[in-house]
Amino acid sequence: MITGIKGFNDILPGEVERWQHIEATARRVFGLYGYAEIRVPILEKTELFCRSIGDTTDIVEKEMYSFVDKGENAVTMRPEGTASVMRAYIEHKLYAQDPVAKLYYMGPMFRYERPQKGRYRQFHQIGAEVTGVTDPKVDAQVLTMLCHFFAELGLTEPTLQINSLGCPECRPVYREALKSFLRERLDRLCDDCKRRYETNPLRALDCKSAHCKEATADAPAMLDHLCAGCDDHFAATRRHLERAGTPYSINNRMVRGLDYYTRTTFELVTGLLGAQSAVAAGGRYDGLIADLDGPAVPGIGFAMGVERVALLLGQQEFARRPDLFIAALGTEAQDEAFRLMCGLQRLGVSVEMDYEGKSLKSQMRRSDKFNSRFTLIIGSDEMASGRATLKAMDTGTQSDVLLDPTAIAGQVK
């Protein structure tokens, strides 16, 4: 038997409906805030992610699915969505159409990681991006929209944590302060953090190693090294969050795993998923578009893991109930049931029937399995009279109905 690849999961009926609910909620909520959907390719030039995410990140160093294609091009299956969306934004000159672009995306991403609960090698993200505005009100609105989405799903447990990573003016000062702190603790860091000490010391704050977490527990905070502009921006973002009624807490150790973030960074975290506590995360990336050879346009965005959101929804039932199940006894009744089913489906009624000529008892068990809203039984008497009894399964109420698609649709829709 050929099985699926480790970390690449099938999403089966019963679970798909949960995903569709998440996606539909995102489309509805994001639409309220003026976002339009964009769809970008799964495969991109490897250079895109090296330049955007950062050469010294875990994603680029260890996790990307990269290969050289038959045309000798170095390509990568996208590990995240922001870089691809910004590449499309630049390539198609969306900045010339409107100074402010609001975009969202959905789709699979790929990283070679150790599969575990809520983390897979093919995983799915829903993300949103805003370009063209540095005003901290936009930061607050993006965060408010994200929290609004989770509230619409009925999920109040994930909590918002925010931080500021400063800008190219103040981050070098913090970088030196952090290097000075780490210099006395290098022997306690993991090999990766030792190697990155010179090139990217901030990665030590994001390291998953227990030794590194312990060694950096009292590390200096970026918030204590912000320049006046970044300090004002972070303070204004917090004020606007409070005006919007969006609760938050400050996590001054948050650095995220992507090098392009500046100023506001954030996560929605939960204690319900074990070690995989972040269900959504993002931040501001005011230099990314210029770094990718686009104009000097600021941006901010986020992505959420659909698998993790689905886990938070638990065992809620999202499978759609058929409107009607038709139980038919005998060949002529089955033919009539098929005619009615086709006519009803054209009228927008969801219908199921038995195709195997089973007993009435067996067909009623199948109706129960489908959890249909109504059941219609057709036998020889019903064929002779042209009428049948329609039963509402939730209430037990019965009504007499003509064996006609329009008449039945009027009763069940």
Swiss-Prot record:
GO BP: histidyl-tRNA aminoacylation
Main localization category: cytoplasm
Gene3D superfamilies associated with the record: Anticodon-binding domain (3.40.50.800), Bira Bifunctional Protein, Domain 2 (3.30.930.10)
GO cellular component: cytoplasm
Classification via Pfam families: HGTP_anticodon, tRNA-synt_His
Substrates-to-products reaction catalysed: tRNA(His) + L-histidine + ATP = L-histidyl-tRNA(His) + AMP + diphosphate + H(+)
Annotated keywords: Aminoacyl-tRNA synthetase, ATP-binding, Cytoplasm, Ligase, Nucleotide-binding, Protein biosynthesis
Keyword set includes Membrane: no
Compartment list: Cytoplasm
EC number: 6.1.1.21
SUPFAM superfamilies: Class II aaRS ABD-related (SSF52954), Class II aaRS and biotin synthetases (SSF55681)
Superkingdom of this protein's organism: Bacteria
Keyword ATP-binding applies: yes
Molecular function (Gene Ontology), one example: histidine-tRNA ligase activity
Membership in a protein family: Belongs to the class-II aminoacyl-tRNA synthetase family.
Subunit structure: Homodimer.
Name used for this protein in its record: Histidine--tRNA ligase
Species of the source: Geobacter metallireducens (strain ATCC 53774 / DSM 7210 / GS-15)
